Amino acid sequence: MNTKQSRIRRARKTRAKIAAVKAIRLAIHRTNSHIYAQIISADGGTVMASASSNDKDLRGQLANGGTTAAAAAVGKRLAEKAKGLGIEKVAFDRAGFKFHGRVKALAEAAREGGLAF
């Protein structure tokens, strides 16, 4: 089993636990050059809000989309969008990635923006 398969296996376990409690989830995806975040409804069928380092408004502000500063900006932007929709509590789905670096920066910025998880 390689590292990608291990990450996907961890992600499946997390998603199953979140689905069992029927919580709105904040799902992230990380690539070498960008970071993406979505708030997904409890039934898993609707993306309620999204933000990424590849968005037009953030792309102009960021020198590089693959940094912790970019991840923090994405977390802050997503928290603002969630507050606008009246979403305050979510379950954090880190998609099997370690809670370190860019993933941690996004999570902390979202918490500072008012999301609880």
From Swiss-Prot:
GO terms for molecular function: 5S rRNA binding; structural constituent of ribosome. Keywords: Ribonucleoprotein, Ribosomal protein, RNA-binding, rRNA-binding. It holds the Pfam family Ribosomal_L18p. GO terms for cellular component: cytosolic large ribosomal subunit. GO terms for biological process: translation. Disulfide bonds: none annotated. CDD domains: Ribosomal_L18_L5e. Belongs to the universal ribosomal protein uL18 family. Part of the 50S ribosomal subunit; part of the 5S rRNA/L5/L18/L25 subcomplex. Contacts the 5S and 23S rRNAs. This is one of the proteins that bind and probably mediate the attachment of the 5S RNA into the large ribosomal subunit, where it forms part of the central protuberance. This is Large ribosomal subunit protein uL18. It comes from Thiobacillus denitrificans (strain ATCC 25259 / T1). The lineage of its organism: Bacteria, Pseudomonadati, Pseudomonadota, Betaproteobacteria, Nitrosomonadales. The gene is rplR.
